[in-house]
């Protein structure tokens, strides 16, 4: 091997190493650039999609508000219908500045504190304790609600709450009132029929039957009165004689004791 060839080979090896190193560096730079481009495109697409969704949501809300505000203007008026040709509705597309505008409720809610950080108290209605109806009429207790004046409440209690009657009205009182033809005074016989008493005050005869009481009761029907007509007449005459007989006896005794 000649010394010239040896020197040539020695000079080739460093040059090949240099070219290989340069090629590797170029490949690494290209790969890094591609990765960066992919990452940038992904980030841009993500932000673009989020911005587009936000803009579409805002435009839908704005369109809904505009539709609600101009709902009466979508239909032609009576004058245009009577004229024959309705006026065309002009649609103006939203401007790009309106699309990017932030709605006011978001601006308000951004600076408002949340519930745990509220400084003012919540205005709740006052607690009212109502009565359950078990207390006496003045309602002495925790009840703090007064719907009426005290005088008016006392008057209502006085008018609505009354004592029971002093006597009990029996069927015999009704029979006496119907036979005598008028109202009778309060009965002192404690519910015993007038036919059961004689002039001496002792009981004579049985009490009136159910048919007699129903026949002489003022609320009975006309047919029942017709069917029990003779019996009612007999009862009337018997009651009349039982009331008149003591009076006649007293008059006779007076005549005997005081002759003319």
Swiss-Prot record:
Residues 60-98, 218-260 are annotated as: Disordered. Disulfide bonds: none annotated. It is found in: Early endosome membrane; Golgi apparatus membrane. Changing residue 210 to A: Abolishes interaction with NEDD4. It is a single-pass membrane protein. GO terms for cellular component: early endosome membrane; endosome membrane; Golgi membrane. One of its GO terms (biological process) is negative regulation of SMAD protein signal transduction. Residues 1-20 are lumenal. A motif (PPxY motif 1) lies at residues 136-139. The chain crosses the membrane at residues 21-43. InterPro entries: TMEPAI/LRAD4. Keywords: Endosome, Golgi apparatus, Membrane, Repeat, Signal transduction inhibitor, Transmembrane, Transmembrane helix, Ubl conjugation pathway. One of its GO terms (molecular function) is R-SMAD binding. A motif (SMAD interaction motif (SIM)) lies at residues 164-167. Functions as a negative regulator of TGF-beta signaling and thereby probably plays a role in cell proliferation, differentiation, apoptosis, motility, extracellular matrix production and immunosuppression. In the canonical TGF-beta pathway, ZFYVE9/SARA recruits the intracellular signal transducer and transcriptional modulators SMAD2 and SMAD3 to the TGF-beta receptor. Phosphorylated by the receptor, SMAD2 and SMAD3 then form a heteromeric complex with SMAD4 that translocates to the nucleus to regulate transcription. The PPxY motifs mediate interaction with NEDD4. The SMAD interaction motif is required for interaction with SMAD2 and SMAD3 and the negative regulation of TGF-beta signaling. Belongs to the PMEPA1 family. Interacts with AR. Interacts with LDLRAD4. Interacts (via the SMAD interaction motif) with SMAD2 and SMAD3. Interacts with NEDD4 (via PPxY motifs). This is Protein TMEPAI. It comes from Mus musculus.
